[in-house]
């Protein structure tokens, strides 16, 4: 890991560049028996530049690049990649009104490669966005703070590009590798929110967001009957808008200050999600596909309620909180049993929609300063859904149902220049559907599923990170450095 920060241009500009890279196969895979024959690799790079034109105008430019790769020798490789480029202009109109104009580009890519005789293929999917947003903050007085703004985004969805080097998987599944499903959409929003203090003990925050989502061509839209069989198709020209969704998203939060160190908060908000992910929940190829809203797939709508109690101790040195939440979700999607999505132009017909719910409690204790600082958090949460034609129509746990989540972060300052830290995280294993049997025909093995969804789980996940940091002596005016040793 290397990070470099420095001012320049007589202090009117500043820059920061950092990067990390690791190859876990060199050390971890040789030390840990269960990881032998596997490779672990990741890197990330980030850079940020800030320039001050004058006291009312500043410009920020930042970028992030990263990849995570997990490989199983002579079998499978999974790659996640992210790219982000952002430019933000901050302008101060006066002592009450400020604005931020942002333009950014993001790209998420997910690729899985399989190399197992006679198969040698890869599937790539992802999302690419180009966005702009303009946000304003208006401080009317000491009691009223108003925020408002607008945004526009151009989405591109890649839903599974098949690269078949031997042709074996295409022949086995009877698909054409050129059948790549690409979709485009436009999304706009207008929003307004107000943080309003009603006296010294009570405050409310309310707002409203208008969101609009439009599908645009070039695209071939396939139409399905009640049995999810394709009965017709419509071809749309490049740039042609063929579907529009518009929704209002209200939100309301209230806080009551019981005394100097404790408070109660309650909130409600509605969110509309125009892009949903469907997960292949079987124990075979782990693959996720993003589906934009369309005439075939409605946007997901979620109503969330939350209630929390917050208490500080020892003059705010220690913060504690307990929060309860409940979510009611409409139009949640999942893949049907035996879904066929590789090179499938009719992939919308493999998706089923239903309703979901999530609930839980979050507990947090944080120590903010002193030689020993850090936090301990625990979250208990459940996520369940009911979807037609899945799990015999009965409720089942979603792929995101991981009931127990523990996080412990501790930092200890041994001297002014030397400190150590430890981080431990634990999560319940992700739900998965394993086959209960198999059979072989003409040398090809097929899995058998009994229709029950997500009855099993992957092993629980836990990780311990240890680090020690030694700050260099301040011998130079223009730069500061530190040495860091981390063990994951």
Regions found by a protein language model. Give the residues of each.
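Predominantly transmembrane beta-strands of Gram-negative outer membrane beta-barrel pores used
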Residues: 1-52, 60-64, 322
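Conserved C-terminal beta-signal and adjacent last beta-strands/turns
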Residues: 5, 50, 303, 397-488
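Short loop/turn motifs that connect adjacent beta-strands in outer-membrane beta-barrel proteins
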Residues: 8-14, 55-56, 95-98, 141-145, ...
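Outer-membrane beta-barrel domain signature, strongest for Gram-negative TonB-dependent receptors
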Residues: 40-161, 319-321
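Surface-exposed extracellular loop regions of Gram-negative outer-membrane beta-barrel proteins
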Residues: 109-110, 156-171, 214-230, 256, ...
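Outer membrane beta-barrel strand-and-loop segments of large Gram-negative receptors
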Residues: 129-133, 179, 187, 292-298, ...
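Signature of Gram-negative outer-membrane beta-barrel scaffolds
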Residues: 147-263, 274, 390
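Gram-negative outer-membrane beta-barrel transporters
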Residues: 325-328, 346-436
């Amino acid at each position: 890991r290397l990070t470099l920060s420095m001012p320049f241009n007589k202090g009117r500009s500043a820059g920061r560049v950092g990067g990390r890279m690791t190859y876990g196969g060199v050390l971890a895979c040789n030390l840990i028996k269960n990881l032998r024959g596997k490779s672990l690799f990741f890197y990330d790079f980030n850079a940020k530049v800030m320039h001050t034109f004058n006291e009312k105008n500043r410009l920020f430019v930042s970028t992030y690049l990263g990849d995570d790769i997990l490989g199983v020798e002579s079998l499978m490789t999974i790659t996640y990649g992210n790219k982000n480029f952002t430019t933000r202009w901050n302008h101060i109109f006066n002592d009450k009104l400020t604005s931020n104009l942002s333009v950014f580009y993001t790209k998420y890519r997910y690729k899985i490669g399989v190399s197992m005789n006679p198969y040698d293929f890869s599937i790539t999917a992802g999302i690419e966005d180009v966005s702009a947003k303009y946000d304003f903050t208006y401080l009317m007085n000491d009691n009223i703070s108003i925020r408002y703004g607008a945004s526009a985004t151009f989405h591109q969805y890649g839903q599974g590009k098949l690269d078949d080097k031997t042709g074996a998987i295409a022949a086995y599944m009877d698909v054409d590798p050129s059948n790549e499903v690409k979709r485009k959409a436009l999304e706009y929003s207008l929003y307004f929110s107000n943080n309003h203090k009603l006296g010294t003990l009570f405050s409310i925050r309310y707002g409203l967001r208008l969101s609009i989502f439009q599908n645009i061509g070039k695209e071939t839209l396939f139409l399905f009957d009640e049995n999810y069989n394709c009965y017709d198709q419509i071809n749309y020209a490049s740039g042609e808008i063929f579907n529009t969704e518009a929704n209002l998203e209200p939100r309301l939060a209230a806080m009551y200050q019981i005394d100097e160190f404790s408070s109660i908060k309650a909130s409600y908000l509605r969110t509309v999600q125009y892009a949903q992910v469907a997960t292949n929940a079987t124990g075979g190829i782990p693959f996720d596909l993003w589906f934009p809203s369309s005439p075939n797939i409605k946007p997901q709508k979620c109503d969330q309620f939350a209630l929390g109690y917050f208490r500080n101790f020892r003059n705010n040195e220690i913060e504690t909180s307990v929060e309860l939440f409940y979510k009611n979700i409409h139009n949640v999607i999942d893949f049907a049993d035996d879904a066929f999505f590789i090179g499938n132009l009719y992939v919308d017909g493999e998706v089923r929609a239903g309703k979901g719910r999530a609930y839980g409690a979050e507990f947090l204790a944080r120590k903010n300063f002193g030689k020993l600082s850090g936090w301990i958090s625990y979250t208990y949460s459940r996520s369940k859904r009911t979807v037609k034609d899945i799990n015999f129509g009965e409720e089942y746990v979603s792929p995101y149902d991981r009931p127990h989540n523990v996080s412990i972060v501790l930092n200890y300052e041994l001297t002014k220049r030397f400190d150590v830290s430890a981080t431990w995280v634990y999560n319940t294993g992700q739900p998965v559907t394993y086959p209960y049997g198999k059979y072989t025909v003409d040398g090809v093995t097929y899995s058998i599923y009994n229709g029950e969804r997500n009855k099993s789980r992957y092993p629980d996940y836990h990780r311990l990170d240890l680090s020690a940091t030694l700050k260099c002596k301040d011998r130079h005016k223009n730069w500061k450095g530190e040495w860091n040793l981390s063990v994951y």
